[in-house]
């Protein structure tokens, strides 16, 4: 493999990328492992030109696709997850803010009062609309509502409790998802659970009514953006919203405050013992306002959007977007040899994020057909039989197709993060088996509001971006695996080198970043678990940074 020289410390602005926060259209809808749009744009600008074809075979929420279109490229977004393609299309869709507001007002007229009636609070002969209901171990213990300009927090009355109990899933006259979750303890999913169990019967009833009215909208473009707002608001309407209890001081002593703050649905299907039930209409309206603000700003963007039906139409005409909801292997097989100018992608990282399982809530509400069998993932769900062997086989064929469709001497950027030894070693060997010359290894920081950053000791707090050049004359060299038994000295030398260069010590992940950069370019790699043990045994930790023991003394 050929590689230009780089280090973690020289020219850090080019090798270690700092993320912007998710704002505007990128904050409209949750999706896991979103990559910072500013960094993705930099790569697209560097490795492709206007009107060239950029492909993301695992496009997720479509950040690479939107940035390609915004920078006047032709973009192909592929993802096996229907929700991913749906979100990507809505991110790019230019919607008239006037038409969207009109449609919202129609939904508001038909639904708001009906939904709010499900949350009525009666006090002193007057009716108020409840905003939040606090549950502890499935018992309603607190109700929140507005009384004039005042926010009221009270214990529930008998009438409040009976109203909440009056809702039953068997009595809902509208569609709601009844599918069981896959059993996966990693994401707190139990096969005995249904999708509808993620919601209180009252919120389930309200959501079903809301979606039923949205589905009656005749304009498909408007209907889709309203569905997008619906799924975007769904997490906050679920039972997965936890309570935040702040610590404060009383008489000089630290204690938990009685006042609770509303948390949010983060990742997985964990239902806290103490959780909020939030008024569904408020969830939907709040998300509508956020989407409307982003879409108003997007209206002024100068880009044009013209979606193609297939690769031929995209490549030969003026079309600039092709979205394919299918497996990466079957989608890439439809693309001719040596026909793509740049590929950038962030594939599933082993068992880190089971995308289709996590997206089941959205996919089932929107009645999407999902191909679980061909997902490239390692899942801890025994229901799925998605082990490392299956992952490696599918990833290998995907890389084979990427190699085939990329033009000679053009670039392929591959984003990755894992703390699993076997996943890393297999990936390194796979990448080495194709006609790719490694050009550069860089790190990508997470956005400040990312929910997937691994903060465990030894967790990689940045992703790696490996950029390759397709070289048909590539000479393949076998990857040498450095082990503690045979090559510990080489590993120690590199750790010493990076710590000395840093002067003030490094965090664990920074040392790992340096070792990956230094060894991979020399066709060498290591077991992450062994390196973590070397660091813990041979170095000293001071204020979360590792140093040579003699320096600490």
Regions found by a protein language model. Name each.
Residues 495-503:
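Short amphipathic alpha-helical interface segments
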Residues 63-72:
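Conserved SAM-binding loop of SAM-dependent methyltransferases across substrates and taxa
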Residues 479-481, 522-553:
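Charged low-complexity interaction tracts in eukaryotic proteins
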Residues 502-515:
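Short acidic, hydrophobic short linear motifs in intrinsically disordered regions
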Residues 3-54, 71-336, 352-384, 398, ...:
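Nucleic-acid modification enzymes, centered on SAM-dependent nucleic-acid methyltransferases
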Residues 343-344:
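Hydrophobic beta-strand segment of the Class I
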Residues 58-62:
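Class I SAM-dependent methyltransferase "Motif I" SAM/SAH-binding loop
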Residues 213, 378-439:
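Conserved Class I SAM-dependent methyltransferase catalytic core
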